[in-house]
Every structure is written in C-alpha cells, then in structure tokens.
C-alpha cells in the first residue's frame, strides 16, 4: 500500500500482478459463471430499494439471484431440467460436472440436489447456503416455465420462451 502510493506520487509507473502459485489455483475472472454471479449482485442491489436491509442480512436472497443469473446466462443447447450444473467449477479447478463452490449442483433431479424450502431452517442464516436454496427454487421455476413455454438457451432469441419469461419475472 504505502510503497505503491509513494511510487505513484513520485510519478513512477507501477505494475501490479496478482499471483497465487498454489496448486490448483485458477483466476476467477476467467470463470464466466463467477463473473455473472458477481454482476448479479449489482443487478439485485440496483433493483432492491435502499433501507430494507434484505440484501445485507443473514437471510438475504442476493446469493441465490446471483447463482440463478449465472445459470441462466451460461445455458447451452442441449441442457435439460436434469442437467446437473455447478457454480465456480473453473475457479475450483474441478470438472464442469462437479458442484464447484456449492453443496449441490443445480438440477431438478432431487437425487442430485435434494434442497427444499425446509432446508432454510438448518442453514444457520448463512447467506450462501440460503442463496443456494433460493437459486434451486428459481432453477426449478425456470424449467417448469420452459416445459410450458419452451426452452431457449439464448434468452434474447425468443422473448416468449419459458427461459426468457422466467428471467423477466425474476428481474
């Protein structure tokens, strides 16, 4: 901090590199899902009025919305309701079929992701755990809407698809 500030004040060029040589380290900025997740926080903070503290308490929904945005904006052709999807798999140096940074992968298959609303009673108010449950419910909603109105991995291609309608409802 002080050294860099002094160098800048002296008019010298400062090059800063962030490195972590730990085994398995991957730069999270190359993980589309993580980047969209973080951008999702910006969306939910912008759309939620100030003064309610619903995005800063232990029962916040922001983590779930952010995971949901990540899932929606990284869909690909061929995904189905039972395709199991992780969050942060690149960053954790795990296979795309792994859970990544969440306890369970997102899917409507209850044998893979057994989360239900009742699980919020046992999270201890941990925001990521509550968010994972909320995102699971939103993901289930997406696939029910896709079942009724059609799935489209490109949400901009058809505003009447269940995928686009779900994203519109959530935002």
Regions found by a protein language model. Give the residues of each.
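Extracellular protease catalytic domains of secreted zymogens
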Residues: 1-171
């Amino acid at each position: 901090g002080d050294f860099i500030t002094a160098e800048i004040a002296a008019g010298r060029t400062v090059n800063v590199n962030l490195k972590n040589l730990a085994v398995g380290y991957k730069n999270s900025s190359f993980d589309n899902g993580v980047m969209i997740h973080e951008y999702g926080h910006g969306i939910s903070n912008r759309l939620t009025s100030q003064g309610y503290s619903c995005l800063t308490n232990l029962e916040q929904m922001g983590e779930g919305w952010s995971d949901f945005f990540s899932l929606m904006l990284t869909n690909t052709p061929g995904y189905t309701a039972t395709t199991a999807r992780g969050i942060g798999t690149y960053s954790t140096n795990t296979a795309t079929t792994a859970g990544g940074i969440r306890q369970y992968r997102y899917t409507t298959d209850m044998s893979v992701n057994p989360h239900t609303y009742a699980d919020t009673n046992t999270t201890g108010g941990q925001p990521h755990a509550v968010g994972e449950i909320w995102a699971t419910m939103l993901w289930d909603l997406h696939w029910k809407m896709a079942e009724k109105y059609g799935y489209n991995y490109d949400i901009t291609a058809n505003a009447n698809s269940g995928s686009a309608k779900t994203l519109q409802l959530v935002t």
